[in-house]
Amino acid sequence: MDGESFFLRHDDDFFEATPWTRGPWNPKHQHAGPPSALVAGRLAEMLDDSFRIVRMAVEVTRPVPIGKLRLERSFRREGRRVRAMMGLLFDEQGKLVMTTDALAIAELDLDAAIREPPMDEPLPAESAEVRFPDFDPAPCYGSAMELRFARGSFGEGDVMAWMRMRHPLLPGVEPSPLERVMVAADSGNGVSQRLSTREYTFLNPDLAVTLTRPAEGEWIGLGARTDMHPRGTGVADTRLYDERGPIGRGVQTLLIRKRDQPLP
């Protein structure tokens, strides 16, 4: 990783997005992966080492601008085994742009008889590097993430892809396993797209991620499938991996529109 970053941190809960967060739908708006990861990492800061976040439920209430952001974070529940947190992200005008609910569980050592599923997909070293289509060539999310297809390709709707960050979320700070997962998981619909991004938009107003264990290493795998309905709705279902094997799942609800079709 070089010295660039997705965000600058001005204070504990005040941030500024850089052009590396730029998404594919509007040059003024962020891809939802970076702000989802930003909030996830800051919620994790509230926990001691005995707890680990295992679920993130993100709702994008309005497009997240490339600009200054303020985060409000709090506990909703502080149990001995389970803790629940909320993060509210606001733009510079004070408008709510993203809500996040996180669930953390206290970890402990269990019987070794519990077996983890093995890796059943090709690894990044065996996969072909590609670029996201139709992203602005200027600094953007598409150029800030390295992407490789292990199986399938754009337009097929059912793929296995690998992603890793070229830049950290914050300057000089190594991304956490949770941040690496969240910044990539929001691309499940992007890698498994069935329609051309030049003709259609398929935004996801939400993202739900559930994890069985922390990711290891830089690469996050997306075993993603998109299903769509002619009435403009869809679901992207993504099995999440690291190079050791499956680590969890991500689900996105899709809002599908033709680019030249006005909303009713």
Task: Give the positions of each predicted feature.
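Terminal targeting signals and extreme-terminal segments of soluble enzymes
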Residues: M1-P264
